[in-house]
């Protein structure tokens, strides 16, 4: 099976063309491939499939390192767009794809940057999904470590966002798993720790569902900015600094799609026998 290794700000992916080759992946196979010592190693595996709708170009599937399938990955979307172009699967500048929970438009800006229309943030608790009687800008969550105030949103996957004073002093790897698996998130959640520098600039660390802390999380950056705007602490165009690099997020507010712009880097091509 042929594949490419790619990354978006250090969030790394194994990308597989399921259009021109037959691909059958089980959770066990994905876990073996994800092993950084005995396999390829990655945060997520991205699978390019033919479209289910003639008006779309591709279907986009995402698998975490633990083998679980998820509906969204923003950094992966940028790498997906770069991959299908590099492999000659399309020559379009605007690439229309479906995911498990919706549709996206991926736009190639230059040799490195890709702009992604992430769709509208979803706030209704039942659709996140999150257990709450109604939408609120802030929720209180209690864990064995501490009680936190957070915002909750879906960008096609569930995000819980906490505002912190200093991300370097925050116990991300202790608090992250407790919130990821909190009983109020029936499908678990990605946990964002956001430090507001000013109204147009944040620093962010993300503990990803099924992957742990990663160098960057595109949908996490989108979720953090959306929560910050809803809570009134951020403006509509925000630079997000993650451990692996920076993203630019734009959102005009409720009723509008959210846009993410950032790098997508091809590392190497490979072949592996399953």
From Swiss-Prot:
InterPro entries: DAP_epimerase_AS, DAP_epimerase_DapF. It is found in: Cytoplasm. It catalyses: (2S,6S)-2,6-diaminopimelate = meso-2,6-diaminopimelate. SUPFAM superfamilies: Diaminopimelate epimerase-like (SSF54506). GO terms for molecular function: diaminopimelate epimerase activity. One of its GO terms (cellular component) is cytosol. The active site is at residues 73, 217. Homodimer. Belongs to the diaminopimelate epimerase family. HAMAP family: DAP_epimerase. This is Diaminopimelate epimerase.
């Amino acid at each position: 099976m042929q594949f490419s290794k790619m990354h978006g700000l250090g969030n790394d992916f194994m990308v597989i063309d399921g259009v021109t080759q037959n691909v059958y992946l089980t959770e066990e196979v994905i876990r073996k491939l994800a092993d950084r010592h005995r396999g390829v190693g990655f945060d997520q595996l991205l699978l390019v499939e033919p479209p289910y709708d003639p008006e779309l170009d591709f279907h986009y599937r995402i698998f975490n390192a633990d083998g679980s399938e998820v509906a969204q990955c923003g950094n992966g979307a940028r790498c997906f767009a770069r991959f299908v172009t590099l492999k000659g699967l399309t020559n379009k500048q605007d690439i229309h794809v479906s995911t498990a929970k919706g549709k996206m438009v991926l736009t190639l800006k230059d040799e490195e940057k890709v702009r992604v229309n992430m769709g509208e943030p979803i706030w209704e608790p039942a659709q996140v999904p999150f257990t709450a009687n109604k939408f609120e800008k802030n929720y209180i969550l209690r864990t064995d470590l501490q009680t936190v105030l957070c915002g909750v949103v879906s960008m096609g996957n569930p995000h819980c966002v906490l505002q912190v004073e200093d991300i370097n002093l925050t116990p991300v790897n202790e608090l992250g798993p407790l919130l990821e698996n909190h009983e109020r998130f029936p499908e678990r959640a990605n946990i964002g720790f956001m430090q507001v520098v000013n109204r147009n600039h944040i620093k962010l660390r993300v503990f990803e569902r099924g992957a742990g802390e990663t160098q960057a999380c595109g949908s996490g950056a989108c979720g953090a900015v959306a929560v910050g705007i809803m809570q009134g602490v951020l403006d509509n165009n925000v630079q997000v600094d993650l451990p692996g690099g920076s993203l630019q997020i734009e959102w005009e507010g409720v009723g509008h799609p959210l846009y993410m712009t950032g790098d997508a880097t091809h590392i190497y091509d490979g072949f592996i026998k399953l």
